[in-house]
Amino acid sequence: MEQRNNLVLQGTETFSRGQLDNLALENGALVLDSVAGRSLLYGSYTTPEFAMPAFCNLNVSWNAHAPRDTMVEVRCRVYAAGAWTAWMSFGKWAPDYPRCSVSSQSEDGMIFLMGDTVTVAAPGGGTGVQLQVNLSTNNDKVTPAVRLLAAAVRPLAWEKRNGHALNRRLYLPEYCLSAHDPSFGREMDLPLVMAALMNRWGEDILPEEVAYAMEDGSTRSTGNTAFAAAAAGCCGYPCWQAWMDLTDLREQIHDGCSVAVQVERRVRGQRDPVRLWMGLRGFGHDDAVMADFVLLNDPTADTDGAVNCTMALVDFMRYFTGKAIALRPKQREAEADRPRRLRCDLRAGSEPGVYYFERRGEPADLPEDFSGWIACAPHDGVAHATTAHRTFLRCTRTEDGGVQFPPELLAAGGRYSVYAVDQTGTMRVAEVRLPKPKPAPASTEPKANGQTGDAPAQP
């Protein structure tokens, strides 16, 4: 068998080579088998054992449709030092479930899983991988469906290929950290890039929706790339982690697909180099200096307009860690679990600048445990390419579940779109017109020498 460092498993023919227990294949996806029209409550799928080039790191991805009351759990094991490890779980997963990564290790501590990455410290590295996915439901009328499984390893002796030169530029929306939710800090870079990759295909999803749909509850961060790929899969996009060389990147751009790439570089305010995510949107050649360059979207730029940047190819290959996330166009037949958007109205409260959500005439107040993002965007008369390009101004939650607008907006008045994304990625959306304050009446009190108002006194 040819050894490849990136494996992507999808489709009926590929999945049928593994072992299905209480599962069936339906429209190319793994689903729970059924008896008399009722789904079984539990089932599992185990892939064949795959030989891999000796590796030090392993990343696993999955794309699944998991309706309410269903769950997916992906596990892996590694062949190293002449034996297979025990199964290691990446945590139970569903769009509406509080996702938490799990840490585990082998008995000798030489192979361990932390977050989204399995590290093999054993001499000679790992040489084999096997995946397993467990499906479960608490409702025999619904079943989860797994559409894609992927495994990517970083070889110990990686002979990186360059491929053929390519001159192609792709459109990729520009989003920067400073214009979006600051709750996650610099780690908001990955949700920004993932939103851009999907919005390139017309999704129009907010980075904040992506962030809360992929948040790792164990670290309260958005740095888990397995959850990032799963979040994109929820929206119907085939998406997986990969360890790529220049040939792989050029093939993705050649096929018209932008890629999320991890680079190591210095950023403002950081003493040591940090790893951050950028969007790769093309390659080019500068005839003036006879050099190749890459086209990137850097979310750490100061403004949306400064996100597009270029970098010499030799510099990019020095900073590129090899870790990437590939995303392909949405398939029409794929069921989607994209974060819910609830169309609401806003009702003015008794306190100045406080409004309350209503849905279909019923109160839809923000719950006490709300820990998401609330913002509003003014209607500025500009046709923005995506909703995420609008200018967002932060609002706050009141103690009784309302939305408090900042004083400067109340002073300006006008029409606004209001967004409240909760910790599951579900978003309330409403429109409101803030009344413009009445101008202060001109003073009519008599002044010196019989003058009134603001007219100057005559000498």
Predicted regions located by residue number:
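Recognizes extended acidic, P/S/T-rich segments that occur
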Residues: 105-110, 371-410
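Surface-exposed, short loops/turns at beta-strand junctions within beta-sandwich domains
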Residues: 121-126, 407-413
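Extracellular fibronectin type III
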Residues: 425-436
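Noncatalytic regulatory segments and standalone regulatory/sensor domains
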Residues: 5-19, 24, 50-53, 124-139, ...
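Conserved active-site-adjacent core of cysteine acyl-enzyme catalytic domains
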Residues: 38, 209-333, 399
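Active-site-adjacent structural segments surrounding the nucleophilic cysteine of cysteine proteases
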Residues: 134-220, 354-359, 385-391, 396-401, ...
